C-alpha cells in the first residue's frame, strides 16, 4: 500500500481513525510513503505540536516500518498529469501539490492508497478498504 500524508498525520495526532489506519498498515507487507508526503506531514505536525511533531513522525515511521520512496522522473510526470486531471480548481478531487505525488506513487506502483478524507476517493486510484 501507499500511505498518504493524511493517514500519517491522523496516526501521529491520535485522531479517532488512528487505530484503524495503523492496523491496515501492519496488515500489509508493502508500506510505501513518498518523501514528499513526509515533508508535508512534518510541516503539518510541527505546526500542531511544535518541534515534537517531527520527532513523533520519525517514531511513527520506525514503528510502522515505512519504506520511504524517492521521487522519480516518472513519478514527477505522473504527478503533473494528476494535477491536470484531479488538481485543486480543476476537479472536485482538488488534489494539492503533495497529493499529486502520493497519487503518482500509488499509480506507478499499482498499490492501493491509504488516506483520510474524500479527495482520493474521487480519483481512479485503488483504495485501501478499512475493516
What positions do the PLM features span?
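Glycine/charged-rich beta-loop-alpha catalytic/anionic-binding loops adjacent to active sites
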Residues: 22-23, 59-62, 83-89
Amino acid at each position: 500500500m501507499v500511505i498518504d500524508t493524511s493517514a500519517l498525520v491522523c496516526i501521529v495526532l491520535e485522531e479517532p481513525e488512528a487505530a484503524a489506519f495503523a492496523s491496515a498498515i501492519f496488515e500489509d507487507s508493502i508500506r510505501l510513503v513518498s518523501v514528499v508526503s513526509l515533508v508535508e506531514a512534518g510541516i503539518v505536525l510541527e505546526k500542531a505540536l511544535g518541534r515534537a511533531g517531527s520527532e513523533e513522525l520519525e517514531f511513527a515511521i520506525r514503528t510502522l516500518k515505512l519504506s520511504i520512496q524517492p521521487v522519480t522522473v516518472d513519478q514527477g510526470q505522473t504527478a503533473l498529469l494528476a494535477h491536470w486531471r484531479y488538481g485543486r480548481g480543476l476537479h472536485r478531487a482538488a488534489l494539492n501539490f503533495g497529493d499529486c505525488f502520493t497519487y503518482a506513487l500509488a499509480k506507478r506502483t499499482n498499490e492501493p492508497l491509504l488516506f483520510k478524507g474524500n479527495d482520493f476517493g474521487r480519483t481512479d486510484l485503488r483504495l485501501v478498504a478499512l475493516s
